[in-house]
Design a protein with these regions (language model features):
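Interhelical loop/hinge segments that connect adjacent transmembrane helices in multipass membrane
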Residues: 1-10, 208-246
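Interfacial transmembrane-helix starts/ends
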Residues: 11-15, 49, 85-100, 104, ...
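Interfacial/gating helices of multi-pass transporter permease domains
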Residues: 36-57, 234-235, 257-277
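Short membrane-interface helical motifs at transmembrane helix boundaries
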Residues: 105-126
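Alpha-helical transmembrane segments of multi-pass membrane proteins
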Residues: 125-151
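Alpha-helical transmembrane segments of multi-pass membrane transporters/permeases
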Residues: 141, 152-178
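Hydrophobic alpha-helical transmembrane segments
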Residues: 168-178, 187-213
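Single conserved hydrophobic/aromatic residue that forms the stacking wall/gate
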Residues: 280-288
C-alpha cells in the first residue's frame, strides 16, 4: 500500500510539473506577443530580444551547466557520505562562488556590452545597436539572480521538492505580462528591461522560504580551496562543453537574423511556438 501511495504521489508530481511547464511556455508566448503588440516588430523589439539573450547566453556558456551537471551530484554525494552539516558547508562555499562569478560576469558584461552586441547581432543599424547595448547593460544584473535561482532549484530537487521549482517561471512571466498591461505605455522598453531583472529576482525570492524549510541557512564562505569545490570543477569541465550547443546555436541564429529587419523578433516567437508544440506532442505521445 505504501509503495502504491508513493507511486501515486510521483505521478501527481510529474503531472503537475508537466502542466506547469506547458503553462509557463504558453505564458512566454503571450509575453512575446505583447512585446510586438506594444513595441512592434522592429527596432525596439529586436534590440530588446538581443539584449535579453546576451546575459543568459553568457551565463549558460560560463556556469549554467556546472549547477545541474556538477554541483548537485557532488552535493548529493556529500549528503549521503558526510551528512547534512558538511553538505551545508559546501553549499555556502558554492553559493558564494556563484555570487562572485556572476558579479564578475555582470561587471564585464556592462563594460563590454558593445562588443557583445556586435558578436550577437553584427549587422544592426547604429540606432538599433545603441539601444541593444543600453538594454543589455540594464539587464545584466539578472545573471546574479539566475545563478542563485538555478542553485536553489537544484537544492530543492535534491530534497525531493519539485512542485515549487516548476512554478517559478509562471511567476516571472506573469510579472512581465502585468508590466505590459499596467505600465507598458508609460515606461516603454526601458521599463520592460528593468522588469526583466525584477522577474528573475522574483524567481530567486520565491525559493528562499522553501530553502529555509529544508534547513539551508546561507553564510558567506570564501574558502574556495576545498576538495569538494575542486571535485565539482573537475566534474564540470567536460560536461560544460556539452552545454554550449544551445547557447551557440542561439548566437548563430541571431547573427544571421540581424541581417534582416524584424527577423530576430520573428525567430524568437517561432522558436517559442515550436517548443510549445514539441511539449504538447511529446505529452500526447506518452499517453499512447
Amino acid at each position: 500500500m505504501k509503495g502504491k501511495t508513493s507511486g501515486q504521489k510521483m505521478l501527481l508530481t510529474a503531472g503537475f510539473m508537466a502542466m506547469a511547464t506547458l503553462l509557463s511556455k504558453v505564458l512566454g508566448l503571450v509575453r512575446d506577443s505583447l512585446l510586438t503588440a506594444y513595441f512592434g516588430s522592429g527596432l525596439e523589439s529586436d534590440a530588446f530580444l538581443t539584449a535579453s539573450t546576451i546575459p543568459t547566453t553568457l551565463f549558460d556558456v560560463i556556469i549554467g551547466g556546472v549547477i545541474s551537471a556538477a554541483f548537485i551530484p557532488v552535493f548529493n554525494d556529500i549528503m549521503s557520505k558526510k551528512g547534512k552539516d558538511e553538505a551545508m558547508k559546501f553549499v555556502n562555499k558554492f553559493v558564494t562562488l556563484i555570487v562572485c562569478i556572476t558579479l564578475f560576469i555582470v561587471v564585464g558584461g556592462i563594460i563590454f556590452r558593445d562588443v557583445l552586441v556586435n558578436i550577437q547581432a553584427p549587422n544592426y543599424t547604429a540606432d538599433k545597436h545603441n539601444l541593444a547595448a543600453q538594454l543589455t547593460a540594464i539587464m545584466f544584473p539578472m545573471v546574479i539572480f539566475t545563478g542563485l535561482a538555478f542553485s536553489f532549484v537544484g537544492l530543492l530537487q535534491s530534497f525531493g521538492e519539485y512542485n515549487i521549482p516548476s512554478i517559478i517561471s509562471l511567476v516571472s512571466n506573469l510579472a512581465i505580462i502585468l508590466y505590459y498591461v499596467v505600465f507598458g505605455k508609460k515606461f516603454g522598453i526601458y521599463g520592460l528591461s528593468v522588469t526583466m531583472v525584477i522577474a528573475w529576482s522574483l524567481q530567486f525570492i520565491i525559493l528562499i522560504p522553501w530553502i529555509k524549510k529544508f534547513g539551508v541557512k546561507y553564510r558567506p564562505d570564501f574558502k574556495f580551496k576545498d576538495p569538494y569545490i575542486k571535485q565539482m570543477l573537475l566534474l564540470a569541465g567536460p560536461m560544460l562543453i556539452s552545454t554550449w550547443v544551445q547557447p551557440l546555436y542561439s548566437i548563430v541564429n541571431q547573427r544571421f537574423a540581424s541581417n534582416i529587419d524584424s527577423a530576430v523578433t520573428y525567430i524568437q516567437q517561432s522558436n517559442r511556438l515550436y517548443i510549445i508544440c514539441l511539449l504538447y506532442t511529446s505529452d500526447a505521445a506518452d499517453e499512447l
